[in-house]
Amino acid sequence: MLLSDKDIRAEIDNGRVRIDPFDDSMVQPSSIDVRLDRYFRVFENHRYPHIDPSVEQVDLTRLVEPEGDEPFILHPGEFVLASTYEVVSLPDDLASRLEGKSSLGRLGLVTHSTAGFIDPGFSGHVTLELSNLATLPIKLWPGMKIGQLCLFRLTSPAEHPYGSERYGSRYQGQRGPTASRSFLNFHRTQV
């Protein structure tokens, strides 16, 4: 069940959902807007001949911070990691989906490639997978609205929520845009 603005506020007011910093003006009819932090992780395309999710490639990305109040310029066809300004913490019976903002999508900005789902129990900055599908560069201003979180109530609390020992939870408590850690639990079935 998708939570309404009334339910979102109630979950925040009683401390079950934490959005930090919280700004009530970000609450929408069935979502809460999130803003862009000031850190970006750019890909170093010359370091490796290819990306291999089965091995650690420590120099694959580099952390970048725009100077002062300057925007980050995302060029056509470019892909970077960024993160929400807000720290998001969910209880064991709520999951979330990160969706893009319609106005930014109409400019060619993709907010996430595939990883828009946030498990119950997660706590941390949400990593964004930003792509520019437009034919012109896009200015990304730290602090701008970048997406919206929709909250869903589970039919029952997760038996092993994100952050529990069972799943490893490689991104629990992440700060800023976090590079892939797929190598930590890479799985391949012989076919």
From Swiss-Prot:
The active site is at E129. It catalyses: dCTP + 2 H2O = dUMP + NH4(+) + diphosphate. DCTP binds at K101, S102, S103, L104, G105, R106, D119, T127, L128, E129, Q148, Y162, Q174. One of its GO terms (biological process) is dUMP biosynthetic process. GO terms for molecular function: dCTP deaminase (dUMP-forming) activity; dCTP deaminase activity; nucleotide binding. Belongs to the dCTP deaminase family. This is dCTP deaminase, dUMP-forming. It comes from Streptomyces coelicolor (strain ATCC BAA-471 / A3(2) / M145). The lineage of its organism: Bacteria, Bacillati, Actinomycetota, Actinomycetes, Kitasatosporales. The gene is dcd.
